[in-house]
């Protein structure tokens, strides 16, 4: 078996794709995604995003999304810059989004993490992220999702406050490679407010230690672990799958 076919799976896998331009240039690469893949979260640089708003760029994006949909994949725009939560930087995010709002993405996915802010600004993250998400929700029509560390979701009322901004999905970064332990962490998070979906982010990054990342296990074993984790959680209401950080790192891992 190749890694792509290793584990029969329900369609619960998603992938962070930080080099979206490579996929735009070579859409056929999507056919190498493992079985069970249902979504790609795809990111571009600011100049690449500007190019997508021009007729030629829009045409290529539509072709990519059409091919993805034919494979049963959703395509969500992924943006990640920690400082966007700060009041002084919030408008920069809104300005970036304004010309993009009519593009054919299936959703907008923001990766916003407290730990990536300067230490002095971390205590105000909770309020800042809520205000930012509310502003983004008012500016776009796509479904809106947030990726952040699972510890944020353990705070009382955090998930409800995020849902109140108009976010429909949270992705909890549970960078724990042991699927039993990862399920123990994720299970209570799925007791959140009704209607808010929750996915679990897992890592196959080379730079992380083996207790956090599945990189050293290789593709086939990593897929087995994610399938195991998904099977444990998919009986719980609101579970919306596993999202892997990242597609590029997965391809570098051994089969």
What are the language-model segments listed below?
Residues 10-21, 73-87, 129-158, 197-207:
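Aromatic-lined carbohydrate-recognition surfaces of secreted/lumenal glycan-active proteins
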Residues 42, 46-80, 119-146:
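Aromatic-lined substrate-binding rim segments of carbohydrate-active enzymes
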Residues 42, 46-49, 105-108, 112-116, ...:
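Aromatic- and acid-rich polysaccharide-binding/catalytic face
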Residues 29-36, 56-72, 97-104, 159-165, ...:
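Acidic (Asp/Glu)-rich catalytic clusters
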Residues 2-38, 43, 79-81, 142-150, ...:
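Boundary/entry segment of secreted carbohydrate-active catalytic domains
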Residues 175-179, 198-255:
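Substrate-binding cleft of secreted/luminal carbohydrate-active enzymes
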Residues 39-48, 96-125, 240-246:
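Active-site groove signature of glycoside hydrolases
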Residues 19-34, 87-101, 152-163, 182-185, ...:
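Short, acidic/polar
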């Amino acid at each position: 078996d190749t890694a792509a076919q290793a584990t029969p799976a329900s369609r619960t896998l998603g992938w962070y794709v930080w080099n979206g331009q490579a996929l735009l240039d070579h859409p056929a690469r999507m056919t190498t995604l493992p079985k069970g893949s249902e979504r790609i979260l795809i990111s571009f640089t600011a100049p690449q995003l500007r190019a997508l708003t021009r007729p030629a760029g829009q045409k290529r994006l539509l072709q990519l999304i059409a091919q993805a949909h034919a494979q049963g994949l959703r395509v969500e725009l992924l943006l990640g810059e920690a400082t966007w939560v700060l009041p002084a930087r919030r408008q920069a995010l809104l300005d970036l989004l304004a010309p993009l709002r009519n593009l054919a993405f299936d959703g907008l996915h923001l990766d916003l993490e407290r730990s990536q802010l300067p230490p002095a600004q971390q205590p105000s993250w909770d309020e800042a992220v809520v205000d930012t998400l509310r502003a983004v929700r008012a500016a776009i029509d796509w479904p809106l999702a947030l990726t952040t560390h699972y510890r944020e979701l353990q705070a009382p009322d955090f998930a409800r406050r995020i849902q109140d901004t108009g976010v429909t999905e949270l992705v909890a970064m549970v960078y724990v490679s042991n699927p039993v332990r990862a399920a123990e962490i994720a299970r209570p998070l799925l007791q959140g407010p009704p209607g808010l979906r929750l996915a679990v982010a897992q890592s196959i990054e080379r730079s992380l230690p083996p207790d956090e990342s599945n990189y050293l296990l290789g593709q086939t074993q990593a897929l087995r672990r994610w399938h195991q984790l998904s099977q444990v959680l998919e009986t719980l209401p609101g579970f919306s799958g596993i999202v892997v950080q990242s597609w590029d790192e997965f391809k570098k891992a051994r089969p």
